[in-house]
């Protein structure tokens, strides 16, 4: 999406060139081959949907086939992401280096500065979130979801029952990458910048905090935790910009110690108490 938005700038950039501004600044003479086609939204959309899933499928196939799991799987994924982050920081990779891709002007001909465009992107994001939730809920409630839960709990017993756990894990891993690609495509035009620092391990840790705060083992909990943490981050960065990370850490530790089931656990507790009163 960032590449499409950069190509949409055209000659409205600082250097009035068909090349993105950072390429002109670095004295690039022509567009790299892997940028071809990204001036078309249809090709960009296809890449958004296909490339993350394809990359995840290839990586997941070899990782799951080698029976890498648990903390070792987490380490290897973080190490690979960190290596890619360092690669994208290089100016010669053609993705803007440290500054990344920014100064986006429009999407599909609509100015990104217009309130109507911002609202449209927000509504599209909300719709995609809702559809993703429905899809995830359907999977969880289906036979596929029950098998995935069993694999999570005791994979060896699932294998002894005759299931090929590789296929199940590979499917859900690829699906998650597919959804992440869509989320990233919606994130970039609304934030206005994308650079390699977005690939740092801290972002993965923050997502784990979202789930822990909202409630592990639930779909709504992840959404609730993401909303709460980002609101808290926005408030803390303004109120205490030098200490907001400490506040975030205290919040995470407090929830882990006193609310092991997250915020969803509070609602479950109240609902169970109400049921007991009715009985």
Residue map of PLM features:
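Transmembrane alpha-helices and adjacent helix-loop boundaries
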Residues: 1-279
